[in-house]
Amino acid sequence: MSQHVDIAAELDFALHLADLADAHTLSPFYRRDFSVDWKENKTEVTELDRATERLLADEIMRHREPHAIFGEEFGSAGASSAPLTWIIDPIDGTSNYTRGIPVWATLIALVNANDEPLVAVVSAPALHSRWWAGRGMGAFNARGKIQVSNVRALDEAQVSVTHHAAWDQVGGTQKLVELQQRAYRSRGFGDFWQHMLVAEGNIDAAVDAIGLEPYDTAAVCLVVREAGGTFTDRLGAASFRNGSAVTSNGHLHSDVLNIIRC
């Protein structure tokens, strides 16, 4: 269905949404002007998460009424049969946000009925950074078009790994350790940022947590792919809905998956 969508126009609209989100989230972050609650899954949420998602949803309904919405805080809105769905994470990295760490972003993606991401924006105003992509248009940041690295050997690669208890539960922790030992250098940049660093060619592969949701992955998936990289789940499937995310420059993807697969 993507041939019936004006991708450039929808990308412009997604960038407009990101502008709204940045204006809503950045000042309270610096002022530390928000309260923190806890969800049932023991993750933090602020009133800014909820208010930002509501702001973006209202703007989408105002200007893209036929489209559906799926967001972290309020779930689905609009017709389930809608040909296009906006997938939103108002603040990816809420834990960082609440602690004054500037590594957080608003993630916005538009996907079609075949679950193909068409446009994506990852906006991290506290990092003074934004990344965006349109299907078939490439991926960009403020400096221009971005592209993944050309590193082809794992022992020359910089990787980022996000570990938590779910990796223990599937017996994968030692595999992550092995990946880090075999890489030239390992860091833990976390959340969206590690994948954007892959897209920019600054690092060469990133392995995320297990238990991710589509609002964590839809936008980063398209940005990485349009930058020439590869996005899969931890088992190698291409869907962004499978609860995990591995990104790379493509050359290293099989090597990474062969080590961490469990």
Predicted features, each with a name:
Residues 1-91, 252:
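N-terminal subdomain of lithium-sensitive/metallo-dependent phosphomonoesterases centered on the IMPase/IPPase/PAP
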Residues 14, 18-21, 120, 220, ...:
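Small-residue (primarily alanine) positions within well-ordered alpha-helices
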Residues 25-28, 49, 60, 94, ...:
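Residue-level signal for inorganic ion chemistry
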Residues 72, 123, 209:
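Conserved residues at the C-terminal ends of beta-strands
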Residues 80-140:
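DPxDG-like acidic metal-binding loop motif
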Residues 141-145:
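A structural micro-motif at secondary-structure boundaries
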Residues 147-262:
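An extended, acidic
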